[in-house]
Each structure stands twice: as structure tokens, then as C-alpha cells.
């Protein structure tokens, strides 16, 4: 049986950063990363943006080249999947039947694309957006595709819609709620992006009720049937309605959890010597007033990886990173700082018509978060307002001529 001092399951941002952080902090033990894809760790956000549009080749989205891992003695066990975990025996069993022992286990598996509760997912031309294989399959179909239906008006769906619209495709976005980005942003930002997509020719349908995905006798997708019986024609369907955390082996082994696996402030699960990080980790977040949440972001994956690595090495620094996120759509660069969970007021700073503005989220007058569209200065200067829990003058906050840094307490 192979044996590693630290075994990392998941070859995404979190898994890669865990290995990097261990070596950066002078860990000299053996490390291996198990990944279910054949590729080296790569950046996932570009799959619905720069890689999908052809702006970046795959080599340019690798987190590190092969030589980096070899030079740091990190073994890459790629194209392999963990089937079960034995906490008592400190080992995992792969789907091929082989067993690997560990001293510490870091679970960084992210999640699998959530599917609609309807038929048609098996049809050729229906895609999720999680892996390079997903993106390559879509790219391979682009030439013969004229019309696309995107199910889900979140960031992944809207980013894909922007790329497809720019490529000249007829795009329809179906969102079940009454606005796009409803789960992650306030109404001002939602309406702005809805208008932008409509201006680029995207048909945005809100309150949309999908009945099923339909296809021909060759099992090729032909459209999406709505609850009223109408069918929206499509050569391609992209489903972007969130993920299901990939934690089944840990839960089966006895780890506490449900919507992900529960971790403490050091990213430890309830099982001995097992950590969980990134999209699959349910944690108490100070920027959500201590609520237990999962964060699906590169920032969270990387920062939790560093927290876990340092704790493995005996550190006592708890996870307390300010959340941030970004999205590129058309020529719009959205940058978010903090979490808007529980906000009771928003202030729009600047004019959305100028395509450069910020939305500030407040609770009891205190700044929780900012969404900054083509407003880098607000994003950079707003971090201190979020981390400091500042309650600035609202008129000054709404005035884009007043730099945010001047609103900090003296």
C-alpha cells in the first residue's frame, strides 16, 4: 500500500494550494494529490470565460506547470477517484480497488454540477460547466451550433451567455427566479446585468419554469420544453444551477455534514486527521456574522488550503479571510468584496448607465460588502470598510467623487 504523510484529494485550486502552502512552510514529508481528471491542477473560472472564448489556451490556465510539482516532490495521482475513506485505518480506497495510506488527509473535491429534476440530461449537446472536458465538448460543438439555451441566471450561466452572444449565437437565458443573480446580489446589480445581456441580444426569461429537455431520435438535444408546453429550440443547452458538494465518501465514513462537510476554524472535519477545504466545506464565516456557509470561490479554496496546511504544521491561525470574487462579462469587470448575506440596505455609488459603479451593502448602517463594476478603486479601497465594519456617512458613501478611503475612521 502506498503511504503519504499528507494525501490531498482533489486537484483543483484548494488541493493545489494546500500542497503549495505545505512546501512554502518548509514541510518535508511526502505529499500526493489525487485528482479525478487526467489534467494537472488548473483554474476553473476561465472555463466559462477566457478558455471558452478562446482567449486563453489550456496551458495558460494551469495553476503550475508539471516541472513545479516535480521539483517540489508532489506526486500527482491523476485520473483516479476515491471511493471510500477509512478514518481508523488512515487510508482511502480508490475506485480501481487500490489503497493509499495517509498521515493527514485534505479533502478538496469541490462539487458536481447540479442537475434539473427533469428528463433530458443524457442528450448529446447538454452540458454542465465544471471540467476542461466539459468546455472542450462545448467548443467542439460550436461550429454547428446556432442557438443555445442557458438554464440558470447565476454567474456561470451569464458568463457563458456573454461568450456565446459575442460568438454570434442566438442565446436564451432561463432563470427560475424573478431576477438574474438573485441568490448572490441585490436588485440594482441584477437589473444592470439583465439589461446588459438584453442589449447584447440575449433573450432573458425570468420566472421561467422548465418542464424537460427534449431531443431527436438520435438522442441529440433539440430544445427545452417549458411548463406551458412551449419549446425553445436549441442546438446546445448549458445547465448552470449550482453544485452538489462531492463529500459522499467522507459522510459515509462518519463525518458531520449535510450540505457539504462541517469543518472548524482550522478546516478540521469531525474525523481525526481529516481536513476539508473549498466549495465542499461548511464553515462558520465571520463575514456572514458567524453563520455556517459554503463559499464557492477561488479565494475561499486558496485561503482555507493555507489555513489547513499551517495547522497540519502546528500553526494556530484560524480561518478569517475576507471573501472576494470576480466575474467577466462582455467588457464588464465585476469585483466583489465581503458577503452581502443579511443586508437591509443598498447604496448605488455612481451611475450604472455609465457602466462604472458600485453597489454597497449595509446592515444597520455597517458596510457588509461591495459589488464593483469597472470600479477598481472602489474595490481596493472598500476592503477596509468591510473588514473594519465601518458605518460611514451614507451621502458620502453614495458620492463617487469622494474616495472610499476617506470614509475610514481617523
From Swiss-Prot:
Top-level enzyme category: oxidoreductase
Keywords: FAD, Flavoprotein, NAD, Oxidoreductase
Entries under InterPro entries matching the protein: FAD-oxidoreductase/Apoptosis, FAD/NAD-bd_sf, FAD/NAD-binding_dom, FAD/NAD-linked_Rdtase_dimer_sf, Reductase_C
Family annotation (Gene3D superfamilies): 3.30.390.30, FAD/NAD(P)-binding domain
Catalytic activity: 2 reduced [2Fe-2S]-[ferredoxin] + NAD(+) + H(+) = 2 oxidized [2Fe-2S]-[ferredoxin] + NADH
Binding site for FAD: 14, 36, 49, 82, 130, 279, 298
GO molecular function, one term: ferredoxin-NAD+ reductase activity
Pfam family, one: Pyr_redox_2
Membrane-crossing segments per the record: none
Enzyme Commission no: 1.18.1.3
GO cellular component terms, semicolon-separated: cytoplasm
Cofactor: FAD
Primary role: Component of the chloroacetanilide N-alkylformylase multicomponent enzyme system involved in the degradation of chloroacetanilide herbicides (N-alkoxyalkyl-N-chloroacetyl-substituted aniline derivatives). In vitro, catalyzes the transfers of electrons from ferredoxin (CndB1) to NADH. N-dealkylase utilizes NADH, but not NADPH, as the electron donor.
Subunit structure comment from the entry: The chloroacetanilide N-alkylformylase multicomponent enzyme system is composed of an oxygenase component (CndA) and an electron transfer component formed by a ferredoxin reductase (CndC1) and a ferredoxin (CndB1). In vitro, chloroacetanilide N-alkylformylase assays in which CndB1 is substituted for CndB2 demonstrate that the two enzymes possess nearly identical activities.
Family of the protein in this entry: Belongs to the FAD-dependent oxidoreductase family.
Name this polypeptide is given: Chloroacetanilide N-alkylformylase, ferredoxin reductase component
Species of origin: Rhizorhabdus wittichii (strain DC-6 / KACC 16600)
Gene: cndC1
Amino acid at each position: 500500500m502506498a503511504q503519504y504523510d499528507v494525501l490531498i484529494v482533489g486537484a483543483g485550486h484548494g488541493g493545489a494550494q494546500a500542497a503549495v502552502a505545505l512546501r512554502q512552510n518548509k514541510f518535508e514529508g511526502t505529499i500526493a494529490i489525487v485528482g479525478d481528471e487526467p489534467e494537472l491542477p488548473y483554474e476553473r473560472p476561465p472555463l466559462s470565460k477566457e478558455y471558452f472564448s478562446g482567449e486563453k489556451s489550456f496551458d495558460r490556465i494551469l495553476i503550475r506547470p508539471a516541472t513545479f510539482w516535480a521539483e517540489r516532490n508532489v506526486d500527482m495521482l491523476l485520473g483516479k477517484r476515491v471511493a471510500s475513506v477509512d478514518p481508523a485505518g488512515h487510508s482511502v480506497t480508490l475506485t480501481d480497488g487500490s489503497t493509499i495510506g495517509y498521515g493527514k488527509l485534505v479533502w478538496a473535491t469541490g462539487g458536481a454540477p447540479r442537475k434539473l429534476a427533469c428528463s433530458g440530461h443524457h442528450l448529446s449537446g447538454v452540458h454542465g460547466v465544471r471540467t476542461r472536458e466539459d468546455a472542450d465538448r462545448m467548443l467542439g460543438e460550436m461550429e454547428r451550433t446556432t442557438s443555445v439555451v442557458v438554464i440558470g441566471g447565476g454567474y456561470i450561466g451569464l458568463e457563458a451567455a456573454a461568450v456565446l452572444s459575442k460568438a454570434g449565437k442566438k442565446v436564451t437565458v432561463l432563470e427560475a427566479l424573478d431576477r438574474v443573480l438573485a441568490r448572490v446580489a441585490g436588485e440594482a446589480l441584477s437589473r444592470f446585468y439583465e439589461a446588459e445581456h438584453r442589449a447584447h441580444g440575449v433573450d432573458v426569461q425570468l420566472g421561467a419554469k422548465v418542464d424537460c429537455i427534449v431531443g431527436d431520435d438520435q438522442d441529440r438535444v433539440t430544445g427545452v420544453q417549458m411548463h406551458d408546453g412551449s419549446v425553445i429550440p436549441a442546438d446546445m443547452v448549458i445547465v448552470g444551477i449550482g453544485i452538489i458538494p462531492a463529500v459522499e465518501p467522507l459522510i459515509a465514513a462518519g463525518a458531520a455534514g449535510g450540505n457539504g462537510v462541517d469543518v472548524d476554524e482550522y478546516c478540521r472535519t469531525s474525523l481525526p486527521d481529516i481536513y476539508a477545504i473549498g466549495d465542499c466545506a461548511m464553515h462558520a464565516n465571520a463575514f456572514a456574522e458567524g453563520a455556517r456557509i459554503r463559499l464557492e470561490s477561488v479565494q475561499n479554496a486558496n485561503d482555507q488550503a493555507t489555513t489547513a496546511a499551517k495547522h497540519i504544521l502546528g500553526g494556530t491561525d484560524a480561518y478569517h479571510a475576507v471573501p472576494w470574487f470576480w466575474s467577466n462579462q462582455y467588457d464588464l469587470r465585476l469585483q466583489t468584496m465581503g458577503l452581502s448575506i443579511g443586508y437591509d440596505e443598498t447604496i448605488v455609488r455612481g451611475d450604472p448607465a455609465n457602466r462604472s459603479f458600485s453597489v454597497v451593502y449595509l446592515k444597520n448602517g455597517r458596510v457588509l460588502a461591495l459589488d464593483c463594476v469597472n470600479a477598481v478603486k472602489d474595490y481596493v479601497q472598500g476592503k477596509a470598510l468591510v473588514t473594519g465594519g465601518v458605518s460611514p456617512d451614507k451621502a458620502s458613501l453614495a458620492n463617487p467623487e469622494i474616495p472610499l478611503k476617506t470614509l475610514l475612521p481617523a
